[in-house]
């Protein structure tokens, strides 16, 4: 295969893979992330069935999302969409009183041309609650792009340059307050420890640099970890998009630097640059110890900060992963393509000693992922392994033929193809599991390898029992 002997990354494009989750599944993690929100999905029974099945595990938690089910009367324009949505939003306000209501458009609202953007401001004015419209429908390339659509819509609601100027004034006044407090303590002859306890951490812990906003939905502990990693380099994170509460959205505007933590947020990055005039830091994504180090180093270089202790920290993490690395070294992996995390995961697994045959990916924004692609190429060269072929919108039939030829030790695939591949002797891992797992930062690399090695460890256990085939002979010939 030509791509396997190439000295540079090879890009191909096939007919398209749409065997993936629907983007409205972003509701699953976003409603938990934004604690004062309510998500209203406007779609058909099919959307409702999908949400019930995909999110059914949270049925006892009284979730903050609901389904506005379109009926025949809605589609044939016999019912007034405005009145129906206003009634639902009024009911949501009475029952939950959220800080924001997010309307999630679906394929049906696109097809029947519902003017959600036109109705939202009028209803918002009447019920006095912000309404954000996000068209997270199945016409996207990958289900993770649902989050991209929601965050891009929320960018429009972020405070602007007025808030930024207020923050800079507050910063100056806090310094004055600190100096006056310090003088007061010296007058009262308090001991040094008491004076140190009142010292604002910002005055000592951070250098003076432009505001930095990070975008991408991550669990609270991971947000704290990444914020702390930058704090160790004396860099302050001004805010996260999305924030834990809608009322705490970060201020964005001219002079603000933004950096993404996920590879599927290209639309959000574009909106931040073009409409809010922010400056994008093009960094690899903080997935795995190597990616996290490169991410921090890139941010440091933009703010002219010399990174401290990153190499030692990365090496220490790799030492702690040695038990997993022994299982994956020399093994091969094939990405069928599902969630746009493929390039970052392939780069990390290459660093772990695996050989990546192919990276299938539903959609590739080469500008947004430029730094990640460069790091992948550099990693392959340093590890002395062939460059993988990158196939955008892969054709599943052709992929199956390539998998049969290559016989990889592991295929990372969508759920639709997992069982058929297992029946043909190919070990698989669901790609959707990487979406819901904590994979960002230095300390979560173990979670990635736990997912990757599980099918490999299962195979070793089955071989120990003498079970080398999960399917009877003769079944595969049918």
UniProtKB/Swiss-Prot annotation:
Cofactor(s) recorded in Swiss-Prot or TrEMBL: [4Fe-4S] cluster
Cofactor note: Binds 1 [4Fe-4S] cluster per heterodimer. The cluster is bound at the heterodimer interface by residues from both subunits.
HAMAP family: ChlN_BchN
GO terms, biological process: light-independent chlorophyll biosynthetic process; photosynthesis, dark reaction
Species lineage: Eukaryota, Viridiplantae, Streptophyta, Chlorokybophyceae, Chlorokybales
Pathway the protein acts in: Porphyrin-containing compound metabolism; chlorophyll biosynthesis (light-independent)
GO CC field: chloroplast
A molecular-function term among this protein's GO annotations: oxidoreductase activity, acting on the CH-CH group of donors, iron-sulfur protein as acceptor
Gene3D superfamilies: Nitrogenase molybdenum iron protein domain
Highest rank taxon of the organism: Eukaryota
Complex and partners: Protochlorophyllide reductase is composed of three subunits; ChlL, ChlN and ChlB. Forms a heterotetramer of two ChlB and two ChlN subunits.
Subcellular location: Plastid, Chloroplast
Catalysed transformations (reactions): chlorophyllide a + oxidized 2[4Fe-4S]-[ferredoxin] + 2 ADP + 2 phosphate = protochlorophyllide a + reduced 2[4Fe-4S]-[ferredoxin] + 2 ATP + 2 H2O
Name assigned to this protein: Light-independent protochlorophyllide reductase subunit N
Protein residues bound to [4Fe-4S] cluster: 22, 47, 107
Protein role: Component of the dark-operative protochlorophyllide reductase (DPOR) that uses Mg-ATP and reduced ferredoxin to reduce ring D of protochlorophyllide (Pchlide) to form chlorophyllide a (Chlide). This reaction is light-independent. The NB-protein (ChlN-ChlB) is the catalytic component of the complex.
Keywords: 4Fe-4S, ATP-binding, Chlorophyll biosynthesis, Chloroplast, Iron, Iron-sulfur, Metal-binding, Nucleotide-binding, Oxidoreductase, Photosynthesis, Plastid
Listed EC numbers: 1.3.7.7
Family as reported in the entry's similarity comment: Belongs to the BchN/ChlN family.
CDD domains listed in its UniProt record: Pchlide_reductase_N
EC supergroup of this enzyme: oxidoreductase
A Pfam match: Oxidored_nitro
Gene that encodes the chain: chlN
């Amino acid at each position: 295969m030509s791509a396997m002997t190439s000295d540079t990354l090879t890009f191909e494009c096939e007919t398209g893979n749409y065997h993936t989750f629907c983007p409205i599944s972003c509701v699953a993690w976003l409603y938990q992330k934004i604690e004062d929100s309510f998500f209203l999905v406007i779609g058909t029974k099919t959307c409702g069935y999908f949400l019930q099945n995909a999110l059914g595990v949270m049925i006892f938690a009284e979730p903050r999302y609901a389904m506005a089910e379109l009926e025949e009367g809605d589609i044939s324009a016999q019912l007034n969409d405005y009145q129906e949505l206003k009634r639902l939003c009024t009911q949501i306000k009475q029952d939950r009183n959220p800080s924001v209501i997010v309307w999630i458009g679906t394929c049906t609202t696109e097809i029947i041309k519902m003017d959600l953007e036109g109705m939202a401001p009028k209803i918002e004015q009447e019920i006095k609650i912000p309404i954000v419209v996000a068209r997270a429908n199945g016409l996207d390339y990958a289900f993770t792009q649902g989050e991209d659509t929601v965050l891009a819509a929320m960018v429009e609601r972020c405070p602007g340059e007025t808030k930024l100027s207020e923050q800079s004034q507050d910063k100056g006044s806090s310094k004055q307050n600190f100096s006056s407090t310090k003088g007061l303590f010296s007058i009262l002859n308090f001991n040094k420890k008491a004076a140190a306890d009142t010292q604002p951490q910002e005055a000592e812990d951070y250098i003076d640099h432009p505001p930095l906003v990070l975008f991408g939905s991550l669990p609270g502990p991971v947000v704290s970890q990444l914020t702390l990693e930058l704090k160790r380099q004396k860099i302050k994170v001004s805010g996260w998009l999305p924030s834990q509460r809608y009322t705490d959205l970060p201020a964005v505007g001219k002079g603000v630097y933004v950096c993404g933590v996920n590879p599927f947020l290209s639309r959000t990055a574009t909106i931040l640059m073009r409409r809010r005039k922010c400056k994008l830091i093009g960094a690899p994504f903080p997935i795995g110890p190597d990616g996290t180090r490169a991410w921090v180093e890139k941010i440091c270089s933009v703010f002219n900060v010399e990174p401290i202790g990153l190499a030692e920290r990365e090496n220490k993490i790799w030492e702690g992963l040695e038990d997993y690395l022994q299982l994956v070294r020399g093994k091969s992996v094939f990405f069928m393509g599902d969630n746009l995390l493929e390039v970052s995961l392939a780069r990390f697994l290459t660093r772990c000693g695996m050989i990546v045959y192919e990276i299938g990916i539903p959609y590739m924004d080469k500008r947004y992922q430029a730094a990640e692609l460069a790091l992948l190429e550099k990693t392959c060269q340093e590890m002395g392994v062939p460059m993988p072929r990158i196939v955008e919108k892969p054709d599943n039939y052709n992929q199956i033929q390539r998998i049969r030829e290559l016989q990889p030790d592991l295929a990372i695939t969508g759920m639709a193809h997992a069982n058929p591949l297992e029946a043909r002797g190919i070990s698989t891992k669901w790609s959707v599991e990487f979406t819901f797992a904590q994979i960002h930062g230095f300390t979560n690399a173990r979670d990635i390898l736990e997912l990757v090695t599980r099918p490999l460890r299962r195979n070793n256990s089955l071989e120990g029992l003498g079970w080398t085939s999960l399917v009877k002979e003769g079944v595969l010939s049918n």
